Amino acid sequence: MPDVIINGPDGRLEGRYTHGTDPNAPIALILHPHPQHGGTMNNKVVYTLYHNYVRRNFSVLRFNFRGVGRSQGVHDKGEGELSDAAAALDWLQSHNPNASTCWIAGFSFGAWIGMQLLMRRPEITGFVSVSPPANMFDFSFLAPCPSSGLVVQGRADELVPEPSVEKLVDKLQHQRDITIDYRVIDGCNHFYKGHLEALDTHVDTYMDKALRQAEEAKNAPAAVDDEEPAIEEDD
C-alpha cells in the first residue's frame, strides 16, 4: 500500500494506492468524510471500503482532500474537493489505462462528492454511498442518476437521520433503468461503531451481485432478429 502524491488543482494531494495484479484490473476511488469534522483517508469506514476493493483485486486509491494531512490547499466547501476527486480519478485512470470498470465509493461528505463526480464522469460504472448527508447537502443534481448503486445507512445515525436518506433513495428508485440497493443497519450510528463488519458484508453482497450481473451481460449472446428481410417485388 504505497504512499502516492497526486498533482491536484490546488497543490499536492496525499494518497494511498494499491495496484491490482491483473493488467485489466478494475479501479475504485474512495472518498473520505468532511475535512472540517475530522474526516481523513484513514477514517475507519474509508479504510473498510478501501480494503473491500483491494480483496477483489481492484486498483484502489484513497486520498486526503485539500488541507487534510499532507495535502496542500484549504477547504473549499465542496467545490474544490470535487476538483480534487476529479484529479484523483484522472491519476488512477492514467495508471490503469486498460481498467475494465470504474467504481466510486464515499462516506458522508465523501458520498456527496462522489455522487457529483458520478454525474460528470460517464466512465464510472457504479457507486457505493455510505450515509449520504441528504439532510445537509443538496442532491437534486442526480436528475437523473446515471448509474445503479448501493446506499448503506445506520438506523441510529445521529447526524444524518435515516428518513432523509430513505427519501433520497425513493427519489432515485423512481428513475428509469436505475436500481438502488438500500441497506439499513439497525443500531448503527453515523460512524459505524461496532458495525464495520456489517457494512463490509453489505458491500460484499452488493459487489458480488453487481460484478456477476456485469459479467453475465458481457457474455450474453447478441440478440438475433428472427424476422426475415422483406423481399421487394418487381414491378
Language-model features, listed with the residues they occupy:
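Serine-hydrolase catalytic machinery in alpha/beta-hydrolase-like enzymes
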Residues: 6-96
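Catalytic histidine-centered segment of alpha/beta-hydrolase-like enzymes
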Residues: 73, 188-200
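Alpha/beta-hydrolase fold nucleophile elbow
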Residues: 96-107
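Gly/Ala-rich beta-loop-alpha elbow adjacent to hydrolase catalytic centers
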Residues: 106-114
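Short beta-strand/loop motif that positions the catalytic acidic residue
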Residues: 145, 150-153, 157
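Short alpha-helix in the alpha/beta-hydrolase fold that links the catalytic acid
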Residues: 147, 161-171
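Acidic catalytic loop of the alpha/beta-hydrolase fold
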Residues: 156-160, 190-191
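Catalytic histidine neighborhood in serine/cysteine hydrolases
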Residues: 172-191
